[in-house]
């Protein structure tokens, strides 16, 4: 009996010793400092006090030889493919997009990478991480890592990492171990404060310049943990391993029944926020179109129905001549007015007939040399002058009237003029004031205000508003009843509402993410209103070199396949974020790079997504355009128009 007891005791001692040796081996692969209680408490305090939310970083995290070996394995054994969507451009490993999907029985190619994965998800390290971040217990069975390399032009736009059961996000950096990664290279991790929950500020308040063997991490905070990866600006590659720690799973220490389900149910991903109306109150400019007057709409209806000459009992015997003709052809006065801006070939009967045919066939138009030579040359001159002589503001607080900054930045960021009162959204109070005092667009008022500012500041280069004034004149032209009649002629659709924005997308800064069109709730009860939005984009970008797409800035329309996207969302949890726009090209309907003097017209229904791709730091100028949207009704008694 004693002998058997001694054998059992000896076996326990051997197992305990083996576990202890294994634990020592794991700890030995990390920097010894992280196991020191004083270091842990100091790091915990740093994280608690950090801004804009709780985050931390550790230099020289793991054994240097191990990480160098991992880097060598990745560079020699893994093939990377460039992937691009509306939110990112990055090089991902084709066979190792998610390390948890690897067949770990075959370790011959990547033994050191496997070892790194083991220690990062070891109980010892998870307990350390859970302690310093105050995240509690973390799952060791639900591993979630991906390998990315950021080369010149690569970027990842603002998001909060809220997907599924993620509890902590981390990035382990592996750039060249023998050279310092400098701030001007780009590729930094930038953290954004929040004006309100789910409404990040336009500008980051913290930036980490990554170095070899450095880890950055933060607790995933729905509505607050917004961050991005700055575009890499030089011909160097910034290798990194992105990963997440998840809520404990069934059978693991710290597992709480129903915790994960409640977390997923109560916390909305960035993508879901963009698609829903949850952000609607906090979006500026709002996707709202102002309803046109009865006076305007009646002319378009008469023209499209072909009853311009019809008389009613209320028709005066001596009818007055209207400034706006109801004829299906342009009057001499209308032709003269439109000729101030539009090229003559697009105003002739033959030119209009050609455009009408194209729109009927495609539900879209692309018109080159839309503006006449005089207006085109004037606009190019003042826009180039603006680019060359005036420094463009890159911080939202520095953006002055008449420009505003689009928010929130996990949906869009660009400069715009909307004909409304000047706003600069820095605080919750700024947003609430705008919501409480909503005004209608008045570009003439904006123009008058600019002249007052210009006169008060003098005619210096820094206060030259020639570009703004010329663009506002263009917006006034597009708002005119005669231009909308021309639009109705081209499309056989009757405009009933409108929105016009002058936009500037700055290099290294601006974009819009893919969204569906929103219909005007006030018009839903009208059965003649088409379930689509007519969108026009007059692109006025003065620089060249956009055709390849490498500089971004292109406007892209693509099909939104719900079933494909459900599968995409399911499969893509390994990516740093999840967004609909794929890079296969199969669903792309229209891809228009920035150009000079091109007018694109698209009838878009809710099955079509649209975005303007992030403009690269390498672009020679901003992307400039005038964006127009109209709700439209059909005057065809046989039925509605077909949408693209």
Swiss-Prot record:
Pfam families: 2OG-FeII_Oxy_4, Ofd1_CTDD. Keywords: Dioxygenase, Iron, Metal-binding, Nucleus, Oxidoreductase, Phosphoprotein, Vitamin C. One of its GO terms (molecular function) is poly(A) binding. Fe cation binds at residues 159, 161, 227. PROSITE patterns: FE2OG_OXY. Coiled coil: none annotated. The keyword Transport does not apply. Its EC number is 1.14.11.-. Its main location: nucleus. Disulfide bonds: none annotated. It is found in: Nucleus. It comes from the Eukaryota. It catalyses: [ribosomal protein uS12]-L-proline + 2-oxoglutarate + O2 = [ribosomal protein uS12]-(3S)-3-hydroxy-L-proline + succinate + CO2; [ribosomal protein uS12]-(3S)-3-hydroxy-L-proline + 2-oxoglutarate + O2 = [ribosomal protein uS12]-(3S)-3,4-dihydroxy-L-proline + succinate + CO2. 2-oxoglutarate binds at residues 173, 238. One of its GO terms (cellular component) is cytoplasm. Prolyl 3,4-dihydroxylase that catalyzes 3,4-dihydroxylation of 'Pro-64' of small ribosomal subunit uS12 (RPS23A and RPS23B), thereby regulating protein translation termination efficiency. Part of a messenger ribonucleoprotein (mRNP) complex at the 3'-UTR of mRNAs. It associates specifically with components of the translation termination complex and is involved in both translation termination and in regulation of normal mRNA decay through translation termination-coupled poly(A) shortening. This is Prolyl 3,4-dihydroxylase TPA1. It comes from Saccharomyces cerevisiae (strain ATCC 204508 / S288c) (Baker's yeast).
């Amino acid at each position: 009996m004693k002998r058997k007891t001694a054998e059992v005791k000896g076996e326990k001692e051997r197992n305990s010793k083996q576990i202890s040796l294994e634990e020592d081996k794991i700890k030995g692969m990390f920097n010894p400092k992280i196991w020191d209680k004083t270091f842990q408490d100091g790091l915990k305090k740093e994280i608690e006090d950090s801004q804009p939310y709780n985050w931390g970083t550790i230099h020289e995290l793991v054994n240097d030889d191990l990480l160098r070996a991992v880097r060598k394995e990745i560079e020699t054994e893994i093939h990377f493919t460039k992937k691009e969507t509306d939110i990112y451009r990055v090089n991902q490993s084709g066979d190792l997009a998610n390390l948890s999907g690897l067949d770990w029985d075959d370790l011959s190619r990547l033994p050191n990478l496997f070892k790194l994965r083991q220690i990062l998800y070891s109980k010892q390290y998870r307990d350390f991480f859970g302690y310093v971040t105050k995240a509690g217990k973390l799952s060791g069975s639900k591993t979630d890592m991906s390998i990315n390399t950021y080369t010149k032009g690569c970027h990842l736009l603002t998001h909060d990492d809220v997907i599924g059961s993620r509890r902590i996000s981390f990035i382990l950096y592996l750039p060249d171990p023998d050279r310092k990664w400098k701030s001007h290279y780009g590729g930094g991790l930038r953290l954004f404060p929040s004006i309100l929950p789910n409404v990040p500020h336009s500008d980051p308040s913290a930036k980490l310049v990554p170095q070899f063997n450095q880890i950055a991490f933060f607790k995933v905070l729905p509505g607050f943990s917004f961050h991005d990866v700055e575009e890499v600006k030089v011909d160097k590659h910034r290798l990194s391993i992105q990963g997440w720690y998840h809520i404990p799973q069934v059978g693991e220490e710290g597992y709480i029944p129903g915790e994960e389900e409640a977390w997923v149910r109560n916390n909305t991903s960035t993508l879901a926020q963009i698609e829903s109306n949850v952000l609607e109150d906090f979006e500026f400019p709002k996707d709202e179109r102002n309803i046109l007057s009865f006076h305007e709409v009646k002319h378009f209806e008469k023209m499209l129905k072909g009853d311009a000459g019809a008389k009613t009992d209320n028709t005066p015997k001596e009818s007055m001549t209207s400034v706006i003709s109801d004829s299906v052809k342009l009057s001499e006065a209308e032709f003269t007015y439109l000729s101030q801006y539009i090229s003559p070939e697009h105003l002739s009967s033959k030119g209009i007939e050609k455009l009408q045919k194209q729109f009927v066939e495609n539900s879209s138009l692309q018109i080159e040399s839309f503006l006449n030579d005089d207006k085109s040359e004037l606009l190019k001159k003042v826009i180039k002058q603006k680019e060359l002589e005036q420094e463009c503001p890159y911080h939202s607080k520095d953006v002055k009237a008449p420009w505003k900054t689009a928010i929130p930045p996990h949906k869009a960021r660009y400069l715009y003029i909307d004909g409304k009162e000047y706003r600069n959204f820095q605080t919750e109070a700024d947003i609430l004031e705008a919501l409480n005092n909503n005004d209608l667009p008045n570009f003439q008022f904006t123009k008058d205000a600019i002249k007052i500012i210009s006169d008060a500041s003098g005619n210096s280069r820094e206060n030259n508003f020639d570009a703004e004034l010329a663009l506002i004149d263009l917006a006034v032209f597009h708002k005119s009843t005669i231009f909308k009649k021309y639009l109705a002629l081209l499309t056989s659709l009757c405009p009933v509402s409108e929105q016009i924005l002058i936009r500037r997308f700055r290099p290294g800064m601006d974009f819009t993410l893919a969204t569906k069109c929103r219909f005007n709730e006030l018009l839903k009860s009208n059965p003649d209103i088409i379930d689509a939005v007519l969108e026009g984009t007059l692109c006025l970008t003065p620089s060249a070199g956009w055709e390849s797409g490498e500089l971004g800035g292109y406007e892209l329309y693509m099909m939104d396949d719900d079933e494909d996207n459900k599968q995409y969302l399911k499969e893509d949890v390994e990516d740093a974020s999840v967004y609909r726009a794929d890079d296969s090209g199969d669903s792309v309907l229209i891809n228009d790079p920035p150009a000079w003097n091109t007018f694109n017209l698209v009838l878009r229904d809710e099955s079509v997504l649209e975005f303007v791709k992030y403009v690269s730091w390498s672009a020679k100028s901003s992307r400039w355009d005038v964006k127009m949207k109209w709700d439209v009704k059909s005057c065809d008694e046989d039925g509605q128009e077909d949408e693209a």
